[in-house]
């Protein structure tokens, strides 16, 4: 818990402190009046003929004390002390205890019930006279009213129950625990850790708060907020100083038996422990003989006298440990010695003990060596090679003067069952029954119960005051107005004084984090919808965000888009779901270990839980080989997972050609996007009027008639490490990605590019201009943050899935805590899809168009024939200077293979140059140019 370092109070807290100070003085005044009470004084219930007042507190004090005695009887003796004690307690808290009308009413109700119960018990248990009742008027009235119905026993039980109930409501703890703490205070003992936690969890003065699992917008709008106010009502000036804490709910009795974990007390050398502080007093610890364990190679100290006699060490040896067996500490049968600081026999005989131990060690080593030699001779006599190897493999006791022993380190391979391949290297072939459900179930993901980490209002208030105090030290005047607690971070929203710029706070973020003793903080200069700035600080206990929890949320279930992807939760704990179709492309960057690959897997699994293979197809490029190769074999793939970067460029080139083909279809059907195209296909299929392919030409396929058009599926291209792809074919890949990013949105091709090196040579300006949606995980510097987000902030993230998301068309950054899933969960989902069907790979995606054209052209070149369109293409190329194969394909309405073959013929005839960086040059000129 963060310690309070600021004594800055609000005006309301100063007013309350003043009231409590007045209550203390009034309590002292009543104690003086109680100590000098005399029944002869003129008071509330009696009159005297004596004109003077005997009571030291005067007539007013005598009147109050007599009133207490008449109303409450003997119970009135404790009321002055209660008034003083309660006022002193709250005054010592110095405004740490939040007040509210409900809490004040609860305390008054509990105290009233407690007084009623105690007065009833005093009336029943003690003697009463016609002039004085032991329980006062209150106790006598209650006994008289309920005695006919409950009798003596019933009134005793009822009075006891009322007293206990009132005590619990008023104090927030049980009477037994209070007695234990009172006894510990008398005996100067500190309460145990468990008792302290239980007190904290059940005391209404220090109400504990827990994070909500899934807070919704409706719940926040309905008033699910806890105001840290100290009075039933507040004026306009007081409301300005209130701190609103969102996403917190009050809990009581959070402690349970599951939180009590067994703890092991580590062995600590006695010479390192000089004094132990108990209850604020320094007490010398009792010396005890620690157990000597041979599980340690180092010698263990016998007592605290080792500081004076460093040469005195116990005899220890190392016992061979077999893998898989529990390590048991073995102790030799030695007489127990009770040591104390007054005993000096050990120090006097240290030399003798050391000689005895060395002799014992040499004797033990000699016997062990002799035993091993005898066993080796017997093994050789019996020609038992396995026994000999076992003996040689046993660890030997290393003495100070042992010779080097040369052991064979060559592994001995043995057959593993029916195979010579190690089980770890064998490919697991699992035969899984085809699931009956249309989509995978969320039961494939592990259900991890959310852990509600407690956080107190006191900690929130103290941290808020520390932030205000440290900002004041840096010359910034600000007031915390709102606090939003999330699963990973807490955002403190501050109102700056007029004339203070938000950039001034951003410039001191590092110094402010150091002053607040946080690992890092992030300053949000703009909070949409609020006139505040935000300071986001990490929580002490971080809550894990699971993928199942996000996929099972209403936000993800009610999303209508096929390409909805779950990212995680925002700082308020609400699930974050994005639509890839609206992005329409995504750029992901983050340093190594920041959670980038887990974030990409989260997006892929979100789609696999939502779409069918005929709706969405994947092209996965994995330079790391191990990140996306687990998805190899799912029916959503258009081709196998690409691990060769040279083939990856071919896959992107195929996407460009597919984009051009789809645009021709959209133009022929007079629609603007893939949604309109699929709707028109469904409309005519419902009327049994399939639409023939309008761009089909004889020779493109083996069909004699144009085939019917089918619905187009979305294509998601995922590149796990974009930097490796840029290193192999940078310029060519940049142009291909730029073309896809510019035009592929309407025809359903979307890109997800991830890299761990967000530098300008990888994320070029051409790529950034066409990919507006970005996600930044933890990066190394502010320069990298500006490269990916055009803003700073990603360098201050906490890692492990903590990210900043910038959507298309908005410069606002949303902090998201990424969802987590294990490798086993990913494997279960992949196996489920593999059991549903096999992938239908498209041949030629990874093949270079130039290679195919060369092979096809080889046969025609041998025959000495040129294409029929060769002369027309030559005229077109020399006049326009265009050397694009896809452009020739569209211009002359030929297939891709034929267009590539013509382009190769142009190269052989010397009309165009060879391919260089994805381009060709026109070498020939028209005759009119001469």
From Swiss-Prot:
Residue ranges annotated for the FtsK domain, each copy included: 573-786
PANTHER family named among the record's database cross-references: DNA TRANSLOCASE FTSK (PTHR22683:SF41), SPORULATION PROTEIN RELATED (PTHR22683)
Domain of life: Bacteria
Keywords: ATP-binding, Cell cycle, Cell division, Cell inner membrane, Cell membrane, Chromosome partition, DNA-binding, Membrane, Nucleotide-binding, Transmembrane, Transmembrane helix
Residue numbers binding ATP: 593-598
Subcellular location: Cell inner membrane
Gene Ontology MF annotations: ATP binding; DNA binding
Classification via Pfam families: FtsK_4TM (PF13491), FtsK_alpha (PF17854), FtsK_gamma (PF09397), FtsK_SpoIIIE (PF01580)
The protein's name in its UniProt record: DNA translocase FtsK
Any GO BP: chromosome segregation
GO cellular component annotations of the record: plasma membrane
Gene3D superfamilies in UniProt: 3.30.980.40, P-loop containing nucleotide triphosphate hydrolases, Winged helix-like DNA-binding domain superfamily/Winged helix DNA-binding domain
PROSITE patterns: FTSK
Role, per record: Essential cell division protein that coordinates cell division and chromosome segregation. The N-terminus is involved in assembly of the cell-division machinery. The C-terminus functions as a DNA motor that moves dsDNA in an ATP-dependent manner towards the dif recombination site, which is located within the replication terminus region. Translocation stops specifically at Xer-dif sites, where FtsK interacts with the Xer recombinase, allowing activation of chromosome unlinking by recombination. FtsK orienting polar sequences (KOPS) guide the direction of DNA translocation.
Family the UniProt entry places it in: Belongs to the FtsK/SpoIIIE/SftA family.
Membrane topology: Multi-pass membrane protein
Swiss-Prot/TrEMBL domain comment: Consists of an N-terminal domain, which is sufficient for the localization to the septal ring and is required for cell division, followed by a linker domain, and a C-terminal domain, which forms the translocation motor involved in chromosome segregation. The C-terminal domain can be further subdivided into alpha, beta and gamma subdomains. The alpha and beta subdomains multimerise to produce a hexameric ring, contain the nucleotide binding motif and form the DNA pump.
Record-annotated membrane-spanning stretches: 14-34, 68-88, 106-126, 128-148, 149-169
Subunit structure: Homohexamer. Forms a ring that surrounds DNA.
